[in-house]
């Protein structure tokens, strides 16, 4: 049962957007998916409450700041949305569970600096075991100097960039209805699905 953790110590970088869409991707493939939310804002849990009954099912994984309940038997894929400022024992407990960690990162010098020490922590866990780490650029305009700087920064870490996602209202409109890119006609979100291909391949391997 793969456990995919979405983590970044900085708030507002798109963790919940990634978590819900990763869960939506797994569900679209017919997997038994649970989505957990360790963030006090409970954005992912609120999103699940909006999800239509006719959409591919995604169950709630009960997670609190003090307790992570083991997913029930029959669950095949687990996604965990984490809070900003994830550190200490919570960081260690979450990393023990994780098979893969996705770090959303915006092309801003402030985001890059705020994330550096966290990525160093992750790299230490990666060396210690099975953990796979992937960086996803969020709200990226490939034509800008900022996106080039983001790639330069990630290159210095030796971590793979598994996706670069554009800034689009599609995520906002779909989230308001409890949906993901993988719940609607592909023709409506064709450009975004293209950007997800590399990330989906990484998730599956």
Model region roles, listed by residue range:
Residues 181-205:
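NTP-binding/hydrolysis catalytic cores, primarily Walker-type P-loop NTPases
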Residues 89-109:
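Inter-motif core of Ras-like GTPase G domains
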Residues 113-130, 138:
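Conserved C-terminal guanine-recognition region of P-loop GTPase G domains, centered on the G4
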Residues 2-13, 20-96, 175-183:
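P-loop/Walker-type NTP enzyme "switch/lid" segment
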Residues 32-33, 78, 132-133, 161-162:
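Hydrophobic anchor at the start of a short beta-strand
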Residues 141, 151-182:
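Beta-strand-loop-alpha "switch" segments that mediate conformational coupling across diverse proteins
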Residues 35, 80, 103, 135-137:
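Structural beta-sheet core signal
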């Amino acid at each position: 049962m793969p456990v995919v953790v979405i983590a970044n110590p900085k708030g507002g970088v798109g963790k919940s957007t990634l978590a819900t869409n990763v869960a939506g991707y797994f569900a679209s493939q017919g997997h038994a998916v649970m989505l957990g939310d360790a963030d006090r804002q409970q954005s992912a849990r609120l999103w699940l409450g909006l999800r239509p009954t006719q959409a591919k099912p995604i169950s709630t994984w009960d997670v609190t700041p003090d307790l992570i309940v083991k997913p029930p038997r029959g669950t095949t894929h687990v996604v965990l949305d984490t809070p900003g400022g994830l550190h200490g024992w919570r960081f260690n407990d979450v990393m023990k569970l994780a098979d893969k960690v996705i770090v959303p990162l915006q092309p801003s010098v402030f985001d890059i600096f705020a994330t550096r020490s966290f990525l160093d922590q992750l790299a230490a866990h990666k060396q210690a075991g099975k953990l796979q780490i992937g960086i996803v650029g969020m709200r990226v305009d490939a034509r800008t100097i900022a996106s080039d700087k983001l790639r330069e920064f990630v290159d210095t870490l030796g971590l793979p960039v598994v996706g670069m996602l554009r800034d689009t209202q599609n995520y906002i409109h779909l989230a308001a209805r409890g949906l993901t890119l993988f719940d609607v006609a592909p023709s409506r979100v064709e450009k975004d699905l293209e950007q997800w291909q590399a990330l989906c391949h990484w998730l599956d391997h």
